[in-house]
Amino acid sequence: MKCLFLLCLCLVPIVVFSSTFTSQNPINLPSDATPVLDVTGKELDPRLSYRIISIGRGALGGDVYLGKSPNSDAPCANGVFRFNSDVGPSGTPVRFIGSSSHFGPHIFEGELLNIQFDISTVKLCVSYTIWKVGDYDASLGTMLLETGGTIGQADSSWFKIVKSSQLGYNLLYCPFSSDDQFCLKVGVVHQNGKRRLALVKDNPLDVSFKQVQ
């Protein structure tokens, strides 16, 4: 897994200097791009808030939420977690901020996007709402999802929603590029008794999206 991360880092210079994609000039989506749908079959709207729900029963289920990272000295909650069961609290609402806003109020499969927890917060914690991928955690052998990212920049904050081979959708982390070969899957690891979203080689998290009323 660590080798895969290092490979992605080696490819970064190639992608960063590519003329086909920058944060100011994202790759255009094809005209037949497929909108992402929520649990009711409606297209995701970047102006609305949604809960990310793990598809599964019991310990395989549970909403995604913002929580305090173990051993973190950050002044605000900065970890992206999944509740331990589908019977429990509701997750933290999120907004999806697409890179192709000129296509209208839609979020498309395979579109580069940012994910932001849509919550009221103090000024100090505003920057701790945007998802990103943190540094390599040697104790867990992977990179953990956290907050503190940036919107619209080619950095550690780019994600995609793609159709799952099982049910629902998967989340991908795509550093600096819209090409799927540079993307890594988002799954779950166990950290201090909690289920933490992280980059995984196998068993990505299958999710659905439910609009927050």
From Swiss-Prot:
One family name in Pfam for this protein: Kunitz_legume
GO molecular function, one term: serine-type endopeptidase inhibitor activity
Subcellular location: Vacuole
Domain of life according to the entry: Eukaryota
UniProt entry keywords in alphabetical sequence: Disulfide bond, Protease inhibitor, Serine protease inhibitor, Signal, Vacuole
Main location: other
Residues with site note (Reactive bond for chymotrypsin): 143-144
Signal peptide boundaries: 1-22
Site (Reactive bond for trypsin): 95-96
Propeptide segments, given as residue ranges: 23-28
One of the record's GO cellular component terms: vacuole
Family annotation (InterPro entries): Kunitz_inhibitor_STI-like_sf (IPR011065), Prot_inh_Kunz-lg (IPR002160)
Residue pairs linked by disulfide bridges in the UniProt entry: 76-125, 174-183
Sequence motif Vacuolar targeting signal, residues: 25-30
Function: Inhibitor of trypsin (serine protease). Protects the plant by inhibiting proteases of invading organisms.
Similarity field: Belongs to the protease inhibitor I3 (leguminous Kunitz-type inhibitor) family.
Protein's name according to its UniProt entry: Serine protease inhibitor 5
Organism, scientific name: Solanum tuberosum
